[in-house]
Structures are given as structure tokens and as C-alpha cells.
């Protein structure tokens, strides 16, 4: 939906040279819509000039590229255009190399207005991208190049020094880009372009390099640290965690492959684990913790008891949890605050079922997102859990992929979920009815790799669709797609 104001703005930008000449004459209240239209339509000349002459202290992608009164399209839910992103960066560069942007034509109130360029919140879904769009990796590289070029570019034009601009970004780094990003962070110190990282994701990065980057980040800006595929173990984590703990405003910590299994204790391992726990107790603002693929069997109470405040998002995928871990979590202060819970890869079919049901009961009032992929839940366990599951009245997302459920079990789930008015997405498994010669109970690996009878599954999809229509729930997405943009990030809940 576009308003007349939007359509008029789009028409004004058709001739970019004329639009640029008109910018000084336009009321600054039009600049936000001008920016959105120029970004959407790839009007790169206008976009560059808008950034160059921006009349407000803040230019925020999250504010400008969302759905608005004039345009229902939310550009933040799409990958950004490479052309538009480059135009924004060029506009910033031009501003920094001009002591008084547009001084000859701009009203006095517009001079030096921009103080913060907030480029955070861009889509980062990890799926295959259109070649004309920019990934978070590309965005990191582009901003890093700008920082380095600003430092190496020599003196600005004669006159007063440029007013510094803080650039807030979400950074992605791996082995290949580490040295480049480190140079950019160093270059931004004392530079008119100050790089400020909100969310850091480091993949396959050695321990010493991770520490070096953390030391360069502003302690007041960082909101999330996400360390992936680093296989740190407790020893590596005990080296890194004190550098993470200095970020007192950190709200999200995502770690993986932390081995603290009490079944194979060692003196060094226990010392490292105790040190890790002590450092975790330093966080005062932590609301999300992800410990995927970490052996936490029988240790969850030690981990969560150290935290100063209740978590709202907890991801414990493939952590080999024991019944006592689930019982502790159900009784802990965290349960009543959980909005997002991921227990994927933990066997919930046997002695863990009752403790899991207790946890679900304890978090029913707040839970919005529940991920139970590959938890070995068959029809019997699902049906026994449905009375509690349907009490999660605010639940929006339910992930059940990789569980041995039949068509009958899925239909029962669909019928019972009608009472959950907020439910929007159910990621369900291929029903066991659609496999040929399936062993029982089927291992998760078989469910993920075995061939599906496409004709049977087509009938299943048609029947589920008819049931959704009949129950007035056609707006709810039932899908087997685990790679789509369905799972919500904690900060978007």
C-alpha cells in the first residue's frame, strides 16, 4: 500500500540531478521518506546526497526502512541492495571529507547535523542470496574498507576538521577477514569515522584472534557476542570469557562446543569450568544464552545459578541434557521468563518427558518460540504433552522437525492448536507414514536422510491444508522447510 505522498516522492526522484538540486529547498520532515524511496528504488545519486546532507543527528536503518504510514513494505525484512548500500557509504565518505557539507546552500540548522549512522538490523538469514544484494559479510567488508580509507586518505579539505560520525554496525568475521577487520577497528580509533559494533559474530576464528578483536570493541556498544564453529572447549573459553565479561551491557551470548560433562571429569577441566562460571556471574544484563552442542549433562544448575538475572531466551540444542537438568530449569527463576526455548537434539522421549512437561508448564505464560527439532518425540509423547502445550497461549512458533510423528499425530496437533490464537508457524516433520521400510523407533539420521514417497506426502499436505481451512486457520504456516526465514531472533520477539 502506497499513499499519495509516497507516490509523489517517488515521482520527484525520477530525475536524480533535479532532485539533488531541490534537496536544500525541501522541508527536512520529508527526508525520512525520501531516504526510504531512494533506497528502495536504488536512486543512488539521490541517496548519496541525502546522507551527505542529512539534517538530523541520527540516520537509522531500523527507523527508516521499516513499514511506515506511507509504504507498507518493510525493507529490513529483505536483503539490502548492494547499489543502495554502497551509495550510503559513499555519502558518508563525502560528508567526512567536507568540513561543512553544503555550506553554501544548506540552512544553518542543517550543518553538521548527522552524528550517528545506524546500519544495524539488516537481514542476515544465511540463505542463498540474490547477486544484487549485500550480505552481512559484504556489509562488514564495505564498512571496514571505508574506515581504512578514511585513515589513509590524508588531510581533508582546508577548514575546520570534519565532525565525527559514529557508525553502528553488526560485524561478521572469519579467518579470511580477520586481519582486514582488525585494521579497520584500529583505524577508527581517533578517526572522524568511529566504528561501533552492536552484534559480533565470529566463525572459525582462533582463540587469540577472537581475543584481539574483543579488545578493540567499544564496551558500551556491544549487545551480542556469537562465536560459531570455533570448537573452543572449556580451555579456550576460559581464556576468552573474561574479555567478553567486560561488556556490561551484553544482552546475548551465543557459545558452542563447550565441554563440561561430569561423566569424564578432569582437574584442568573442572578448574576451567569453575572459572567460566565465575565469569558468567559478572553479566548483569544478559537475557539470551545459547550453548548449542555443549556437553552440559548434569551441569545446567551450576551454569544457570551463576547468572544475576533471569534469561528470556535459552538455547540448549544437542547438550545431552539429563532429567535433573530439565527439573532444575523448571524450578529455576528462568522458566517463568522464557520467551524462546530451544531443546533440539535432546532426547525427550523417555525419562526426560515428565521433566520437560514440567518445564513447559512453568514457561507456558511467556513462551513465544519453542524449538524441539530431533527430540525423538513420537505420537505417544506428543499426545501426552498436548494438554500442556496448548496452555502456551502466546506461542507463535513451534518447531518439531525430525521427530517420528505420524499423520494422525499431526492432525491431532493441528486440531488442538486451534486454541492458540497467536500461533503463526509450525515446522513439522515428514510423517512416518510417508517413508518406506522405516525402522522403529527411527533414528533422527534416518528421518533426515531416508527417501520420502512424494505422492503420499502430497496427500498429507493437501489434507493438512483442508483442515486449516476448515478450522479458520489458513493464515498459519505448516511447513517442512527448516531452512526458511522462519525462526525468530530473540531481539525480534
UniProtKB/Swiss-Prot annotation:
Induction: Down-regulated in response to toll-like receptor ligand.
A Gene Ontology BP annotation from the UniProt entry: negative regulation of NF-kappaB transcription factor activity
GO cellular component: cytoplasm; cytosol
Major subcellular site: cytoplasm
Keyword Magnesium attributed: no
Pfam families: LRR_6
Subcellular location: Cytoplasm
Protein keywords: Cytoplasm, Leucine-rich repeat, Repeat
One example GO MF annotation: kinase binding
Intervals holding LRR repeats: 111-146, 194-218, 219-246, 247-282, 283-307, 308-339, 340-360, 364-391, 392-416
Recorded family membership: Belongs to the PRAME family. LRRC14 subfamily.
Record's subunit section: Interacts with IKBKB; disrupts IKBKB-IKBKG interaction preventing I-kappa-B-kinase (IKK) core complex formation and leading to a decrease of IKBKB phosphorylation and NF-kappaB activation. Interacts with CHUK.
Function: Negatively regulates Toll-like receptor-mediated NF-kappa-B signaling by disrupting IKK core complex formation through interaction with IKBKB.
Protein name listed in UniProt: Leucine-rich repeat-containing protein 14
Organism: Homo sapiens (Human)
Amino acid at each position: 500500500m502506497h499513499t499519495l505522498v509516497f507516490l509523489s516522492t517517488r515521482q520527484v526522484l525520477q530525475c536524480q540531478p533535479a532532485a539533488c538540486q531541490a534537496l536544500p529547498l525541501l522541508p527536512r520532515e520529508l527526508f525520512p521518506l525520501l531516504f526510504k524511496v531512494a533506497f528502495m528504488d536504488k536512486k543512488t545519486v539521490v541517496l548519496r546526497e541525502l546522507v551527505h546532507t542529512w539534517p538530523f543527528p541520527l540516520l537509522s536503518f531500523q527507523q527508516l526502512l521499516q513499514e511506515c504510514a506511507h509504504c507498507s513494505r518493510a525493507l529490513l525484512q529483505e536483503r539490502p541492495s548492494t547499489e543502495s548500500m554502497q551509495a550510503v557509504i559513499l555519502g558518508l565518505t563525502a560528508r567526512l571529507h567536507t568540513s561543512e557539507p553544503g555550506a553554501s546552500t544548506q540552512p544553518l540548522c542543517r550543518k553538521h547535523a548527522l552524528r550517528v549512522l545506524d546500519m544495524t538490523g539488516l537481514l542476515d538469514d544465511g540463505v542463498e542470496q540474490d547477486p544484487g544484494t549485500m550480505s552481512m559479510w559484504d556489509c562488514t567488508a564495505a564498512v571496514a574498507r571505508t574506515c581504512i580509507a578514511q585513515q589513509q586518505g590524508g588531510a581533508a579539505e582546508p577548514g575546520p576538521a570534519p565532525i565525527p560520525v559514529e557508525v553502528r554496525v553488526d560485524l561478521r568475521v572469519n579467518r579470511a577477514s580477520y586481519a582486514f577487520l582488525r585494521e579497520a577497528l584500529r583505524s577508527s580509533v581517533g578517526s572522524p569515522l568511529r566504528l561501533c559494533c552492536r552484534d559480533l559474530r565470529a566463525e572459525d576464528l582462533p582463540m587469540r584472534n577472537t581475543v584481539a578483536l574483543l579488545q578493540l570493541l567499544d564496551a558500551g556498544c556491544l549487545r551480542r557476542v556469537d562465536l560459531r564453529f570455533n570448537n573452543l572447549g572449556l580451555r579456550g573459553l576460559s581464556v576468552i570469557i573474561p574479555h567478553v565479561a567486560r561488556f556490561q551491557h551484553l544482552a546475548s551470548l551465543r557459545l558452542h562446543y563447550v565441554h563440561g560433562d561430569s561423566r569424564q571429569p578432569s582437574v584442568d577441566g573442572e578448574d576451567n569450568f569453575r572459572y567460566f562460571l565465575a565469569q558468567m556471574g559478572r553479566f548483569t544484563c544478559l537475557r539470551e544464552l545459547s550453548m548449542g552442542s555443549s556437553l552440559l549433562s548434569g551441569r545446567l544448575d551450576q551454569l544457570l545459578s551463576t547468572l544475576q538475572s533471569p534469561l528470556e531466551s535459552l538455547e540448549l540444542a544437542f547438550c545431552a541434557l539429563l532429567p535433573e537438568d530439565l527439573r532444575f530449569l523448571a524450578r529455576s527463576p528462568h522458566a517463568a521468563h522464557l520467551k524462546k526455548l530451544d531443546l533440539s537434539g535432546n532426547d525427550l522421549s523417555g525419562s526426560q518427558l515428565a521433566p520437560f512437561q514440567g518445564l513447559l508448564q512453568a514457561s507456558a505464560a511467556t513462551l513465544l518460540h519453542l524449538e524441539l527439532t530431533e527430540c525423538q518425540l513420537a505420537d505417544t509423547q506428543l499426545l501426552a504433552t498436548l494438554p500442556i502445550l496448548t496452555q502456551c497461549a502466546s506461542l507463535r512458533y513451534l518447531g518439531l522437525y525430525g521427530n517420528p510423528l505420524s499423520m494422525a499425530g499431526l492432525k491431532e496437533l493441528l486440531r488442538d492448536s486451534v486454541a492458540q490464537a497467536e500461533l503463526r508457524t509450525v515446522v513439522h516433520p515428514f510423517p512416518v507414514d510417508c517413508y518406506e521400510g522405516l525402522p522403529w523407533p527411527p533414528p533422527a539420521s534416518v528421518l533426515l536422510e531416508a527417501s520420502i514417497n512424494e505422492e503420499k506426502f502430497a496427500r498429507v499436505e493437501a489434507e493438512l491444508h483442508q483442515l486449516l481451512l476448515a478450522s479458520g486457520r489458513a493464515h498459519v504456516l505448516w511447513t517442512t522447510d527448516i531452512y526458511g526465514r522462519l525462526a525468530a531472533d530473540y531481539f525480534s520477539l
